[in-house]
UniProtKB/Swiss-Prot annotation:
Pfam families: PGM_PMM_I, PGM_PMM_II, PGM_PMM_III, PGM_PMM_IV
CDD domains the UniProt entry points to: GlmM (cd05802)
GO cellular component term of the entry, any: cytosol
Encoding gene (name): glmM
E.C. code: 5.4.2.10
Protein source organism: Pseudomonas savastanoi pv. phaseolicola (strain 1448A / Race 6) (Pseudomonas syringae pv. phaseolicola (strain 1448A / Race 6))
Function: Catalyzes the conversion of glucosamine-6-phosphate to glucosamine-1-phosphate.
Cofactor note: Binds 1 Mg(2+) ion per subunit.
Binding-site list for Mg(2+): S102, D241, D243, D245
Annotated protein name in UniProt: Phosphoglucosamine mutase
Post-translational modification: Activated by phosphorylation.
GO BP annotations listed: carbohydrate metabolic process; peptidoglycan biosynthetic process; UDP-N-acetylglucosamine biosynthetic process
Length: 447
């Protein structure tokens, strides 16, 4: 298998100003992508972004590179990542480019691509782009340069798409919901989707200034949303991340409902209505309780590697519809081609309205096993802590001691310099002790 030089598990991501997240690299990346897609014929490429300040700089650089390669460019402005996937497909473009670092702070940014079908870019095209990145840059003749235009009604198109996932006979009258937009890409569209469906909406963190994206808000910092739901006597809260591809929710008591629980609510509703195609795809990090609860409903469950691209690949291979991660990436293939936070939250609300129960009651139908996750910073000392013999021996010993009633998982993050240590089992005190023991050992090996 060819080793990627630039692309990670979810595109290219890093600190702004540090290679490869620089204007110079983005110019070359735009050109390389344009050349790769031009090999398939004339092409149009959509470009969208989240709200971080560096997005404007990188948008200009990509636009110039794409045009230099002879590719036409359609600029969407700040839009959720799944909206860019949807619009790439409906505009019959050859590709879509997202400028975003998702849930990361404002000082990070990144690039990911969608194919013309609104799916993650095939590996062979990524490799073609990588090869072109190392080639000398050329510029098309003036008459062949790409044209650049802006799509002014992109938000309205996506709002209507989201609403189309809700039956026309259904509205959200009587529902009070608090939405936290993380000062990110959903800040315009999400409140309007829920308002137009009839809900009473209280909006948090929808004043982006380029620097406040994900800052103490959104799906990675749920405290303000939890407090607001209780203070407003709302039925629920919905927390999006900065680019709108992951969602967590809060029930009326202020309790967080994570991705595993949301996935179970959607899957159970589909199963009870005879609409579930196949089973459910989770990840190595999915709670054991999800697997057991689905088994009680005779719903098949498989685990993919961590990352929504692996969940999507597993769904495609099995021709299943529903998958996701406990972090809140939820894929509903019956409606969208990628993880879509707004679509997922709408499907949860529809499931609750059909069943006549609250989010708090639905959450309790999934009995989660205690799961402790500790992130250990990995500075890249040259030693792989995950495969280190002493770490492997300790993991084997802990697994044996749990006697089939728990799991141990160590993995390196695909987007950050972290080793994630996860231990799961029936006894929380025991699980925490094991996790802390393993995390300490990993830290020592990393040092």
């Amino acid at each position: 298998m060819t080793t990627r030089k630039y692309f990670g598990t979810d595109g290219i991501r890093g600190r702004v100003g540090q290679f490869p997240i620089t204007p110079e690299f983005m110019l070359k990346l735009g050109w390389a992508a344009g050349m790769a897609f031009r090999k398939m014929g004339a092409c149009r490429i959509l470009v969208g972004k989240d709200t971080r300040i560096s997005g404007y700089m990188f948008e200009s650089a990509l636009e110039a590179g794409l045009s230099a390669a002879g590719a036409d460019v359609l600029l969407l402005g700040p839009m959720p990542t799944p909206a860019i996937a949807y619009l790439t497909r409906t505009f019959h473009a050859e590709a879509g480019i997202v400028i975003s670092a998702s849930h990361n702070p404002h000082y990070d940014n990144g690039i990911k691509f969608f194919s013309g079908q609104g799916t993650k870019l095939p590996d062979e095209i990524e490799m073609m782009i990588e090869e072109l990145l190392d080639a000398p840059m050329t510029v098309a003749e003036s008459e062949n340069l790409g044209k650049v235009s802006r799509i002014n009604d992109a938000a309205g198109r996506y709002i209507e798409f989201c609403k189309s996932s809700v039956p026309t006979s259904t509205d959200f009258a009587g529902l009070k919901v608090v939405i936290d937009c993380a000062h990110g890409a959903t800040y315009k569209v999400a409140p309007n989707v829920f308002r137009e469906l009839g809900a009473q909406v209280v909006v948090l963190s929808a004043q982006p200034d380029g620097l406040n994206i994900n800052k103490n808000c959104g799906s990675t910092h749920m405290e303000a949303l939890q407090a607001a739901v209780v203070a407003e006597h709302a039925d629920m809260g919905i927390g999006f991340d900065g680019d709108g591809d992951r969602v967590l929710m809060v029930d009326h008591t202020g309790t967080i409902v994570d991705g595993d629980e949301l996935l179970y609510i959607i899957a159970r509703d589909l199963h009870e209505r005879g609409r579930l195609q196949g089973g459910v795809v989770g990840t190595l990090m999915s709670n054991l309780g999800l697997e057991l609860a689905l088994a009680e409903q005779s719903i098949p469950f498989v685990r993919a590697n961590v990352g929504d691209r692996y969940v999507i690949a597993e769904l495609l291979e099995r021709n299943w519809q529903i998958g996701g991660e406990n972090s809140g990436h939820i894929v509903c293939f019956q409606h969208a081609t990628t993880g879509d936070a707004i679509i997922a939250s709408l499907q949860v609300i529809l499931a609750l309205r059909r069943s006549g129960i609250s989010l708090a009651e639905a959450r309790l139908k999934l009995r989660k096993c205690p799961q402790i996750l500790i992130n250990v910073r990995f500075a890249g000392s040259g030693v792989d802590p995950v495969s280190h013999p002493s770490v492997q021996q300790a993991c084997a010993r802990v697994t044996e001691q749990m006697a089939g009633r728990g799991r141990v998982l160590l993995r390196k993050s695909g987007t950050e310099p972290l080793v994630r240590v996860m231990v799961e089992g029936e006894d929380e005190t025991q699980v925490r002790s094991y996790a802390e023991e393993l995390a300490k050992l990993v830290a020592e090996v990393c040092a």
